[in-house]
Amino acid sequence: MSKKLISIVDVKDYVGQEVTIGAWVANKSGKGKIAFVQLRDGSAFFQGVAFKPNFIEKYGEESGLEKFDVIKRLNQETSVYVTGIVKEDERSKFGYELDITDLEVIGESHEYPITPKEHGTDFLMDNRHLWLRSRKQMAVMQIRNAIIYSTYEFFDQNGFIKFDSPILSENAAEDSTELFETDYFGKPAFLSQSGQLYLEAGAMALGRVFDFGPVFRAEKSKTRRHLTEFWMMDAEYSFLSHEESLDLQEAYVKALIQGVLDRAPQALDILERDVEALKRYIAEPFKRVSYDDAITLLQEHEADEDTDYEHLEHGDDFGSPHETWISNYFGVPTFVVNYPASFKAFYMKPVPGNPERVLCADLLAPEGYGEIIGGSMREDDYDALVAKMDELGMDKSEYDFYLDLRKYGSVPHGGFGIGIERMVTFVAGTKHIREAIPFPRMLHRIKP
């Protein structure tokens, strides 16, 4: 194959011209003198149409019939070089169609397991390496890519430096019961839950830093919102107030949504996502409500006919039904701020004048997607942090480097983290987080 290849997504620039595309056959139909071939190349889906009379006219009867017969016998997922004239077609969702003039088979495909019929979730997950080729799964991956691209763009534009934290560590950032342990030359080591502790060191050196990478939680959870391995963006910054941190988080989430609208509009269309809702989340300010006000609100509405959550007292933590109700009540992404210190991490700074509450926030996404961001101001006073660790019975020797940060020029600082898969699930409008990552790792799944 010597002709220059173009991507399907670029065919709009070649209307009326003959082009060659390297693609896979997603589906095929037609009868008699016409064949329709659904093509995909990773950038988009595209329909090609082959007319038998045109092949006979161009190649002669014997060669023309032979070439047309090859097209008629194509199997799903056969890889091909296909050549044709790009034409505008208002009937097509893509807006264009390919009048096929030639086709060369690259790799045959026989008995492809994921046929156009309905399949069960377990079957599709067992064949995840193939399921990724489907239209909707490709769309989700394109949205994921847009979110990752927009993450780097946003932090670069806001003066942050990429700072890579280690994946192996001898201590936990938060809950030590959720760690995956491994042997590190005869000593115990743990897969990272978060890069936050190391990012705080980065913030003391570079001012504003972020990292992006895989993290691991040994949670024995089978909900639609949990993975044991997922990708996290953590950001840390010095000399920023709590309110300024919330402003930054809001701007970041809006930038991610806008990035998907700009870079993956066809993916949103394939998934039938409510684009107007996404635009509204950008246009309207996010709501901010204190934890205690949220509890009061839940108590006031728990007898309503449309509520489905358990009663909570002040000091109780939210469950998913409570988060869903709160975000749906306000109708836009909602920050719940100043949670009780009793169930938050040791490093969070208390609210001035109220040591039972901490300067933190969870961002709850509407439409039932729940928490997508968690963040806080960090305790920057050495003595206060040591006292908190002693209260919790923590081994301070495991956090000597972390305590050092408070001994040598400590400053007000904070940070937040976002699970990329939760953000992908929210923006894409998918029902389960397992579709937001190429190869999900869950309680009972570690392959393919």
From Swiss-Prot:
Which reaction(s) does the protein catalyse, per the Swiss-Prot or TrEMBL entry? Answer: tRNA(Asn) + L-asparagine + ATP = L-asparaginyl-tRNA(Asn) + AMP + diphosphate + H(+)
* UniProt-recorded name of the protein: Asparagine--tRNA ligase
Q: Which GO terms describe its cellular component?
A: cytoplasm
Asked whether the keyword Iron-sulfur is assigned, the reply is no
Cellular localization per UniProt: Cytoplasm
**Organism the protein comes from:** Streptococcus agalactiae serotype V (strain ATCC BAA-611 / 2603 V/R)
Q: Which domain of life is it from?
A: Bacteria
Q: Which SUPFAM superfamilies match?
A: Class II aaRS and biotin synthetases, Nucleic acid-binding proteins
Subunit relationships: Homodimer.
Homology family: Belongs to the class-II aminoacyl-tRNA synthetase family.
Enzyme class (EC, first level): ligase
Q: Name one GO biological process term.
A: asparaginyl-tRNA aminoacylation
